[in-house]
């Protein structure tokens, strides 16, 4: 997340929802309503922090399907990094990078607004990692 960008606000409705699930929910809304309530162009748009022209998240991060599978195993399932990597079908270097990013960005999660807890292990209340740990 971008500090003071998508973390700004008083209430974060999708705080505890994985990126792949957000897209699935948007598609569900459109199917359920029988019309395009959420534009398909928005749903299918490549993820970007939009900090600079042409920036795409998947140029610097694993694909969200891999990232979400890893996080569901590592955070929600409290599995080891190795087991989470197997589940997400990613290599050790990618798994180590994801874990580093999780720990390095703890300070952002501490500053983000409150939101509903939907998973078994939500960042914040159920997941605490020292912000100064190396």
Regions found by a protein language model. Name each.
Residues 1-134:
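ATP/NTP-dependent adenylation/nucleotidyl-transfer catalytic domains that generate, transfer
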């Amino acid at each position: 997340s971008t500090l003071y960008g998508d973390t700004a606000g008083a209430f974060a409705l999708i705080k505890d929802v994985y990126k792949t699930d957000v897209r699935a929910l948007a598609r569900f809304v459109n199917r359920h309503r029988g019309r395009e309530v959420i534009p398909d162009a928005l749903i299918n748009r490549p993820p970007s922090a939009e900090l600079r022209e042409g920036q795409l998240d998947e140029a610097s991060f694993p694909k969200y399907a891999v990232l979400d599978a890893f996080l569901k195993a590592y955070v929600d399932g409290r599995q080891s990094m190795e087991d989470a990597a197997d589940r997400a079908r990613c290599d050790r270097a990618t798994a180590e990078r994801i874990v580093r990013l999780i720990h390095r960005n703890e300070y952002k999660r501490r500053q983000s607004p409150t939101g509903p807890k939907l998973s078994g292990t939500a960042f914040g209340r159920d997941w605490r990692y020292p912000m100064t740990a190396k």
